[in-house]
Curated annotation (Swiss-Prot):
Organism lineage: Bacteria, Pseudomonadati, Pseudomonadota, Betaproteobacteria, Burkholderiales
Database matches in Gene3D superfamilies: Glycogen Phosphorylase B
Enzyme class: transferase
Record's catalysed reaction(s): [(1->4)-alpha-D-glucosyl](n) + ADP-alpha-D-glucose = [(1->4)-alpha-D-glucosyl](n+1) + ADP + H(+)
Function (record text): Synthesizes alpha-1,4-glucan chains using ADP-glucose.
Protein residues bound to ADP-alpha-D-glucose: K15
Start and end residues of each stretch annotated as Disordered: 483-508
Keywords carried by this UniProt record: Glycogen biosynthesis, Glycosyltransferase, Transferase
Name of this chain's protein: Glycogen synthase
Taxonomic source organism: Paracidovorax citrulli (strain AAC00-1) (Acidovorax citrulli)
Coiled-coil residue windows: none
GO terms assigned for molecular function: alpha-1,4-glucan glucosyltransferase (ADP-glucose donor) activity; alpha-1,4-glucan glucosyltransferase (UDP-glucose donor) activity
BP GO annotations: glycogen biosynthetic process
EC number: 2.4.1.21
Length: 508
């Protein structure tokens, strides 16, 4: 199959979150299975691009769309070719892909509408780059209009509509939906018949993500549990009715991790290598991390790590609420991240009171992130919801049993230490509350202090799990095949939908 992977970000070129990591890892994993994959993304300012431009295609101004160019970049090695959408007036800006220091870019609807429209055009016989995709794989709201545009192209082609690509949309985080005033719809070339409740309309506005969910031939999300959760009012963010109506086309596929980059036996960012069979180097990593952060070298204290956004969604308020107890019980804390200023301040205040046993670094440092994963005894990740998550997989790969909530990808990738079959890899909260967090931390402390053999078994279980991308890639290829063989999909009628008060969000 020929697959176009359309995305707004891809590490290391540009990354604001997990989508950037997936865009870097999944396409080459699919290509390794024998499929032809191209990756489409905008040409942002100052991207650290390495490769050779081997093709150039002009896209003249047409209707709402400004003139642009498609540049093909071959990066060599295992990397898939890039198609960069160059339109300096839309993409050559500072800040993140979605916002400047002053806030969201006011023309984001046009910026990402163009990206989705070009993605859809590449799925037609009139592809502007001389290469036509069989599947257009959209990711989150910035490319989610592509399935709708493909529907318009297919309908316009009449009997020749079967030559138009099928589509998939992957939901990486349903909280971000690309919601814009409805007057953008006409400017983006969306036909009126697609603007009712059974189409892209969402509480009187245009929802790019809802359009993708309604018109895609296949819908995926980043873990099986999250696929179930987003069909509930609690985590559906106003789209649970749409997702329940389309449940037959919805599938959860657990993300993988880059097992070359996140591998303690060959990680150049940690002071000593180690493996499931030779764990000695982990003690050296713990000692080095303590030295770096100024923590006491106390052999009786268990070191808990945390790397992530400092928000209530990530359960940071529970970490703050349980920190004093954790320290009293013989723990230490090494925290790296940024987010809510109030939570940052609360963590810093705790660290100031306990400088020998708690350290907080506000910001991000890749080397320190690896050091925390390698040097900690356990990793805290008590998210209230987590579509997939990566750090819990990194932690298991590094022999650092995580403490997690039973949600999303955390539930799918961590087995509790009390597993009757002896396959435990971490500690799963028994509920979602401060008390449940404190109890799980207490279980981890108790096992680490009293049962070293059981703890080593927990470490080895996690380190021996395969979190690579191959299994995920196979599942996506199977889903592509199902989308190609599926009969024409039609949006659900209004009677099939049920909305709650939405939490629309246009940006990450």
């Amino acid at each position: 199959m020929k697959i176009l992977f359309a995305t707004s970000e891809c590490a290391p070129l540009v990354k604001t979150g997990g989508l950037g990591d997936v865009s870097a890892a999944l396409p080459p994993a699919i290509a390794a299975l024998g499929h032809e994959v191209m990756l489409l993304m905008p040409a942002y300012a100052d991207m650290p691009l390495q490769g050779n431009i081997t093709g150039w295609h002009s896209l003249p101004a047409e209707g709402p769309w400004p003139a642009a160019q498609l540049l093909r970049v071959d990066r060599g090695g295992h990397e898939v070719p890039l198609l960069l959408l160059s339109c300096p007036q839309l993409y050559a800006r500072g800040g993140s892909p979605y916002a400047s220091a002053q806030g969201d870019h006011p023309d984001n609807a046009l910026r990402f509408g163009l990206l989705a429209h070009v993605a859809a055009r590449i799925g037609t016989p009139q592809s502007p780059c001389g290469w036509t995709a069989d599947i257009v794989h959209a990711n989150d709201w910035p490319t989610a209009l592509a399935p709708l545009y493909l529907r318009q192209f297919r309908d316009a082609a009449g009997p020749r509509g079967d030559a138009v690509a099928r589509s998939m949309v992957t939901v990486h985080n349903l909280a971000f939906q690309g919601v814009f005033p409805m007057d953008w719809a006409q400017r983006l070339g969306i036909e009126d018949r697609h603007l009712g409740i059974e189409g892209a309309e969402f509480w009187g506005q245009l929802s790019m993500l809802k359009a993708g969910l309604q018109y895609a031939d296949a819908i995926t999300t980043v873990s099986p549990t999250y696929a179930r959760e987003i069909q509930t009012p609690e985590l559906g963010f106003g789209l649970d009715g749409v997702l329940r109506a389309r449940a037959g086309r919805l599938q959860g596929i657990l993300n993988g991790i880059d097992t070359a980059l996140w591998n303690p036996s060959q990680d150049t960012l940690i002071p000593a290598p180690f493996s499931a069979d030779r764990l000695e180097g982990k003690a050296a990593c713990k000692a080095a991390l303590r030295r770096t952060l100024g923590l006491a070298q106390d052999g009786d204290r268990m070191l808990f790590g945390l790397v992530g956004r400092m928000t209530e969604q990530k359960g940071i308020d529970w970490v703050i609420g349980g920190a004093e107890r954790l320290l009293r019980q013989g723990g230490q804390l090494a925290i790296l991240g940024s987010g809510d200023p109030a939570l940052e301040s609360a963590l810093r205040a705790l660290a100031k009171r306990h400088p020998r046993h708690m350290h907080v670094t506000v910001g991000f440092d890749e080397s320190l992130a690896h050091g925390i994963e390698a040097g900690s005894d356990s990793f805290l990740m008590p998210s209230r919801f987590e579509p997939c998550g990566l750090n819990q997989m990194y932690s298991q790969a590094y022999g650092t049993p995580p403490v997690v909530t039973p949600t999303g990808g955390l539930a799918d990738s961590v087995t509790d230490a009390d597993d009757p079959a002896g396959n435990g890899t971490g500690f799963v909260l028994r509920g979602s509350s401060q008390a449940a967090f404190d109890q799980a931390v207490g279980r981890a402390l108790h096992l680490w202090k009293t049962a070293p053999d059981a703890w080593r078994r927990l470490q080895r279980n996690g380190m021996q799990r395969d979190f690579g991308w191959t299994a995920s890639a196979r599942a996506y290829v199977q889903a592509y095949g199902a989308a190609r063989n599926r009969a024409e999909t039609r949006p659900q009628t209004a009677s099939a939908l049920s909305y709650r008060e939405p939490r629309p969000a246009a940006e990450y």
